[in-house]
Amino acid sequence: MGEPSPSRRRSITSGIPCPSPTKQVLPPPPPEELHNILRKRPRSSAIPTTSQTHVRAPRKETDVVDRIWHDIDEEQREKLARRKEEAAKRKEQQPAQHIRDYLPLTATNLRNFRNEDSTISDFIHRQGMVDKLLGYKMLLGKMENCGTLGYEKMSEDEVQQLSREWLKNFFPSEQAHVGPRTPPSPAVDSDGGSYPKRPRRGPKTPPGSPGPSMDQAAVNRRELIEQLARNFGISSYKVEETLGTGLDKALEDCSKKLKNELMETFKDQLLSQIDRKTKIRDDLSDQMELVSDCSLSPDLIKKEEPDVVYHMAVPPPPIPPPIQPPPYSYYPVAPAAAPQVYHYAPPPPPPPPHPQQGLYQQNMMAYPPPMQHFNAPPPPMAPYQHQAPPSIVLPPVNVPPPPIGVRIDTPIPTAVLPIPTMVPPPPLPPPQAPFSGDCWRAQPAAPVPASVPVSSAPPPSVVVNVQSTLFSALGLHHKPPPPPPPPPPPTTSSTTTSHIPPPPPPPLPFSSAPPPPPPLPMVAAGPSPPSFVPPPPPPNPNQNPSIVLSPSAVTGGGGYRHRVNQFPPQQQQSFSNF
């Protein structure tokens, strides 16, 4: 709907009826931006109409809007008028600020607070002396002398007069007695020195200031006089007049005696206290020394006790046996010349093709007469050598139990064969074809000062294969000669063995083979030809009739196997048939 024309708007606001038959009423236009809030109600036209008589009646919507604006304006006017009235009343009712009232917390008052002295002046101008003292204390920060407060020293007459008033106030119960109240004697007044000093009226110094306290002599004298007057039923004046100066002297003497007695008592108490503290201190020091000694002694005992117990209880450690590898051996250690049987040796071997047959053949080869030494050369490559301290003969009790799965039913010699404790050698090479011939070879001596036990015969299955060759070569059908003297100690030893004294040799089988050839001179060990061994030279009477058995140096022979790098340097026994 379009905006009404100005003429129509004027007719609506003025209340003139519209010529249109419908008489449509439009809302008033919105107020302008700079419309005054305190606007007045629009005046009606000067033309007298019938509607002017009913202006106050809300016959039209425009009257309701104007009334709302008018109510708002009236509320604002009332608020402004009320504020003005309250401000005027506050100014009228605000009294003059008293000196002792607190100042308002304004910036100016806070700035001048250091120089503000209204409270100080109020205290200073009061009538009470304590208030004035507090005022000066606040003003100057310290207690001033009475002269600063305006007080003057009193004369003697004023002091006496005040003293009488003070005595009246001090002894109100003695008013019924007849006579003056302890008048001073003229002699005492003339002298002026013996009259008891009484506290004067008026403050000489402010309370709390240093100085002599009030003399209690007069009080004590007055109490004594009153007590005497009550006891004798006379007035205190008569008592004082009768005693005269004797009372003062008695009081002085009594006071001196009391002072001396008190001083002596205090001195004795102090000395006893000091002695007691000194004694306690000495006792404490002694106790502390004892405690310190007691505390130190257990530490020394604790420090020395482990060593003493160790030296007393722990014997010298025995020489430990050589450390064994995981595989265990069940027999004592044998000398180097003895055959080396390892713990993993199976039970009796099968027929000759089995590699273990050579081992038993070596056992038979090393079955010479007792107490004879064999010299074995070192192999080309020495196996692992286990260095150990000197061995100790250990009983079989120390042998650990056999592991599970290992059989120990292998027939062993009558005299238990020593078994080495070194690391097992490398695997055996394939066997070589045997040949018939002699296998004697002179070898350099590498002896070990140990006796070789004589063992019983090996199983029959092995003896059958080597009897014809070994017994005929060794000539065991003759009685063996006595053993030669022991050779010098060896320079190197690859194994550490323990020895067991050999039992007497068992009877040996008889062999009709011819005696062995004479011994050969000592020569160095070396590989021999694979196919032929030269015969031995004729016997030499000047040569030591001892030969050396060296199976490891021979590569072939009847019933022998060549074993290289299998055993460490062994010691073999030599013997002679002559």
Curated annotation (Swiss-Prot):
Q: Which GO terms describe its biological process?
A: mRNA processing
GO cellular component, as recorded: nuclear speck
User: Which UniProt keyword terms apply here?
Assistant: mRNA processing, Nucleus
Q: In which tissues is it expressed?
A: Expressed in germline, oocytes, epidermis, pharyngeal bulb and neurons.
Q: Which domain of life is it from?
A: Eukaryota
Q: Does the keyword Phosphoprotein apply?
A: no
* Subunit architecture: May interact (via C-terminus) with ssup-72; the interaction may prevent ssup-72 binding to RNA polymerase II subunit ama-1.
Name the chain's protein. Answer: Synaptic defective enhancer 1
Q: Which organism is it from?
A: Caenorhabditis elegans
Q: Which gene encodes it?
A: sydn-1
